[in-house]
Amino acid sequence: MTSSAFFSRRFRYQADAVIKPSIITLLGVAFVIVAMPVCAEENPAPPAAAAGSPSAVGPAAATKAWLATVPRDKREKSDAYFEGRYWLLLWNFLLTAAICIFLLESRISARLRDFAERATKVRSLQIACYAIPYFLIVATLTFPLNLYENFLREHQYGLATQSFLPWFREQLIGFGLTIIGGTILLIALYAVFRKAPRTWWAWATAVMVIFLLGVVFIAPVFIEPLFNTYTPLMKPEISDPILAMARANQIPTGQVFEVDASRQTTRVSANVAGFLGTTRIALNDNLLKECTLPEIRAVMAHEMGHYVLNHGAKLLTYSGIFLAIGFALTRILFDAAMRRWGVRWGVRSIADPAGLPLLALIFGTLLFLATPFLNTIVRVTEREADAFGINTSREPDGMVKVALKLGAYRKLDPTPLEEFIFFDHPSGRARIRMAMDWKAANLPAGESSPLETPLPHDGH
């Protein structure tokens, strides 16, 4: 979400990482933890492997056979879609970097600062008067790429169901939330910059962590319903098994919600979100339409894993560490840039909002360069949730079939280097292999049919 607009509506089971390094990237780390609430329980121990469990074939051969069931044309289409995102990652970075440089070199940023100072003498209102036109300029200049990436291209690959006007309406809602959330954040950050010009990086980290906590708390209740309707799932044959898994893992909710995501996308998704009384289990209507009960159980157990394994708190901690390092490096680079170009750009100091494009450029560049490492952190938590999910649901074939469905828009069999750099979730191949390893080790012949080995698809 895509990366990724400010308040992403993507669920964690299929989230994408497309980074747009502007001031919005200072907010973007919230996306990783919005759907992973802060609460922890022990991970249930996997059942003991049955001695001598028969298998028709080994896990490696079964994995290869499952991958071979995907027709070549569908595989090529999926690969082309996902590999195109590698380039979009670069184009988004280059575009927003160019915008930041343009705002500095043209002194538009300095003129916005001058306008804000003429409009009011109140410091916090000056930041607001600067931030609103700044966000408007950035949104306008990035709109063509946003339109291609999130509307035209999604329709090109058959992943979107929304016509332009409803899509544009949601973009406007997202922009309004960016204005509100981004302005509040900038007011707080610039108050820190003024009061602690040398140690601002440490205090700014604390501000960002508090902001992220706020987003995690309010998103399920106040933000996500702006884009989708959540209704109680009225199918007990589906909700009862999900709630049984939730009760077994002490997840404090008594209801499952259905999300009307099919009016926007063909993707399947689900999440367990919220904390402090806002916890909610939700799955989208595409998942209900396209998946069997074993597949749904596999997905929901994975999402419960994020909750039970306390991934929200862990990722918030990792985010705090990354922010502290990023802000510390940004301070050094910002001061160096100021000594060389500050007068030319009309930027006075870190406390001057005219320096916001420089701050965004430096921090966004660091974020862009750190993409492989940030993706790895998230990918590790996703693999932990996969392990929890398969132990909880005991649905290895369901996990495999969902991985293949996600393969409609995620490359199933990337190279190790691709997976390290670009994947914030385990690849389909990795998930299928985990499921087959688990099935071979944990399901005795009396509990499950012999290791299912699909026949390769004979189409092209």
Name each region found by the language model.
Residues 41-106, 110-350, 360-460:
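Polar-ligand-bearing catalytic/cofactor-coordination segments
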Residues 31-40, 217:
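C-terminal segment of classical bacterial N-terminal signal peptides
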Residues 27-28, 38, 389:
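Cleavable N-terminal signal peptides
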Residues 353:
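Helix-loop-beta hinge of the Bergerat
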Residues 1-20:
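N-terminal secretory signal peptides that target proteins for export/translocation
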Residues 2-4, 37-43:
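N-terminal acidic, proline/glycine-rich, low-complexity intrinsically disordered segments
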Residues 22-34:
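Bacterial N-terminal signal peptides
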